[in-house]
Amino acid sequence: MGKTNLGIDQEGFPYIAIFAFSSLIFAILGWWLLAVLCLIGTIFCGHFFRDPERIIPTEANIAVSPADGKIIRIEPRQDPISGESHTCISIFMNICNVHVNRSPIKGQIEAIQYVQGHFLNASLDKAAKENEHCSYLLRDQDGKQWVVVQIAGLIARRIVCRTKEGDILNRGERFGIIRFGSRVDLYLPEEYTPTVNLGNKVIAGETILAKKNQE
């Protein structure tokens, strides 16, 4: 979903093409400083929109990280779809992280809610409610409810959703991207406990964020 054979998300191609073409034109004109700056822009966009393959864990009753980044919050919070309180794990993606988002579980998307808003620093607590965000309600094979929220940030100004209600996602499957620095929140069912701590670095589709409680 959005992945190309070049290992770059399709959202990056317009940016890469513009910078590369500009670099070529400036080089032809002999404007070397501008040519070099545009070449740097080309390399940066290629790096930012990279989409590497991931090794998805096959262990049962786990949830993997929906995003690359750093754990900045683990706390009870009302999810934006049901309004019920669940443990929420917040992942902040800086501008150097891979920004392709992946499903934490295998499940069906029952609802998608997009809300326009501000573009505050995504690491702020109030960004969850006030910033532009897109929420996904997933139902796993056990009937448990999960909510994933893409939150736009200070620099990120576009949330890209590549799924629709009724779609079934596999664990670790790509479902969207947020441009240029942002945040993703994962709300857990009460039967699951976080396996990460504040400050941990996580990898989308690979790092295990939560496990089901032993009965």
Swiss-Prot record:
Record-linked InterPro entries: PS_Dcarbxylase (IPR003817), PSD-A (IPR033175)
Site for Cleavage (non-hydrolytic), residues: 181-182
Compartments, record wording: Cell membrane
GO-annotated cellular components: plasma membrane
UniProt remark on cofactor binding: Binds 1 pyruvoyl group covalently per subunit.
Post-translational modification as stated in the protein's UniProt record: Is synthesized initially as an inactive proenzyme. Formation of the active enzyme involves a self-maturation process in which the active site pyruvoyl group is generated from an internal serine residue via an autocatalytic post-translational modification. Two non-identical subunits are generated from the proenzyme in this reaction, and the pyruvate is formed at the N-terminus of the alpha chain, which is derived from the carboxyl end of the proenzyme.
Transmembrane helix recorded as keyword: no
Cofactor(s) it depends on: pyruvate
GO BP: phosphatidylethanolamine biosynthetic process
Membrane spanning stretches: none
Modified residues (Pyruvic acid (Ser)): 182
EC numbers for this chain: 4.1.1.65
Reactions this protein catalyses: a 1,2-diacyl-sn-glycero-3-phospho-L-serine + H(+) = a 1,2-diacyl-sn-glycero-3-phosphoethanolamine + CO2
Record carries keyword Iron-sulfur: no
Biological pathway: Phospholipid metabolism; phosphatidylethanolamine biosynthesis; phosphatidylethanolamine from CDP-diacylglycerol: step 2/2
Keywords attached to this entry: Cell membrane, Decarboxylase, Lipid biosynthesis, Lipid metabolism, Lyase, Membrane, Phospholipid biosynthesis, Phospholipid metabolism, Pyruvate, Zymogen
Protein's membrane topology: Peripheral membrane protein
Location of the active site: 182
GO molecular function, a single term: phosphatidylserine decarboxylase activity
Family the entry assigns: Belongs to the phosphatidylserine decarboxylase family. PSD-A subfamily.
HAMAP family according to UniProt: PS_decarb_PSD_A (MF_00664)
NCBIfam families, A to Z: PRK05305.1-2, PRK05305.2-5
Described purpose of this protein according to its UniProt entry: Catalyzes the formation of phosphatidylethanolamine (PtdEtn) from phosphatidylserine (PtdSer).
Subunit record text: Heterodimer of a large membrane-associated beta subunit and a small pyruvoyl-containing alpha subunit.
Protein name: Phosphatidylserine decarboxylase proenzyme
